[in-house]
C-alpha cells in the first residue's frame, strides 16, 4: 500500500446521482495523469446506498455514505475531514474534466501568494461550446449585485486567467 501524501484530494458529493457520478469519475480517470490524487465521493443520504455501488464499480475511490443528507457544504466538509492531499479540489458530481486542466490550475494557484483558490473555465454540459463561468465581477456598491463573466457566450479561448472575487461552487480548487 502507498502511504505517500497525494498531491490532490478530489471531493465530490453524490445525492441520487449515480450515473452522473460515474460519468464524472470516468472523465477524471480518462484525463488526469500528471498528479497523484485520492478521490473521495460522499454519498449524501441517497435513497439507495450508492456509496457501495460506486466503491464496487471504482475500487480506486473512497466512497463514504452519510445516512442523512448533510447539504452541499456538509457533504463537502465530510470529505474535507477525510482528505489527505496537499490541495483540495471540490467538484460537483455532474462535471466532466478536460485534459491538462489540473496542471494548469496548480500552476496558476502557485503563481502568486495572493491567490487563495482557483476555479477553471466551466462550459455548459448541454452546449459544450457555451461558457457557464469564466469568473465573476466585483459586487456593485450601488446594487450589491455582480455578474458571471462570459455566461452563455461561445468559448473561443478568449477568456484568459483573471482575478475573480468568487470561485464557482461547481469546481473550487
Each predicted region: which residue ranges?
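Cell-envelope/extracellular polymer assembly enzymes that use nucleotide-activated donors
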Residues: 7-9, 38
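Short, acidic, metal-binding catalytic loop of nucleotide-sugar glycosyltransferases
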Residues: 26-36
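Glycine-rich, basic loop-to-helix element that forms the pyrophosphate-binding segment
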Residues: 65-83, 93
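Short aromatic/hydrophobic "clamp" motif used to bind/position activated sugar donors
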Residues: 88
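Conserved donor NDP-sugar-binding/catalytic core segment of glycosyltransferases
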Residues: 96-133, 139-141
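A recurrent flexible, glycine/aromatic-enriched loop bordering the glycosyltransferase active site
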Residues: 153-173
Amino acid at each position: 500500500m502507498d502511504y505517500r501524501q497525494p498531491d490532490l484530494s478530489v471531493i465530490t458529493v453524490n445525492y441520487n446521482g449515480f450515473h452522473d457520478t460515474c460519468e464524472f469519475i470516468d472523465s477524471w480517470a480518462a484525463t488526469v495523469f500528471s498528479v497523484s490524487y485520492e478521490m473521495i465521493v460522499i454519498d449524501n443520504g441517497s435513497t439507495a446506498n450508492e456509496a457501495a455501488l460506486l466503491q464496487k464499480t471504482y475500487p480506486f475511490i473512497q466512497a463514504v455514505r452519510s445516512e442523512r443528507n448533510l447539504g452541499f457544504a456538509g457533504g463537502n466538509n465530510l470529505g474535507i475531514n477525510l482528505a489527505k492531499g496537499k490541495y483540495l479540489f471540490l467538484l460537483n458530481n455532474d462535471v466532466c474534466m478536460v485534459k491538462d486542466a489540473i496542471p494548469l490550475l496548480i500552476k496558476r494557484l502557485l503563481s502568486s501568494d495572493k491567490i487563495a483558490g482557483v476555479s477553471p473555465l466551466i462550459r455548459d454540459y448541454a452546449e459544450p461550446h457555451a461558457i457557464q463561468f469564466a469568473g465573476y465581477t466585483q459586487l456593485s456598491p450601488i446594487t450589491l449585485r455582480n455578474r458571471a463573466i462570459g455566461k452563455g457566450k461561445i468559448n473561443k479561448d478568449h477568456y484568459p486567467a483573471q482575478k475573480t472575487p468568487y470561485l464557482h461552487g461547481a469546481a473550487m480548487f
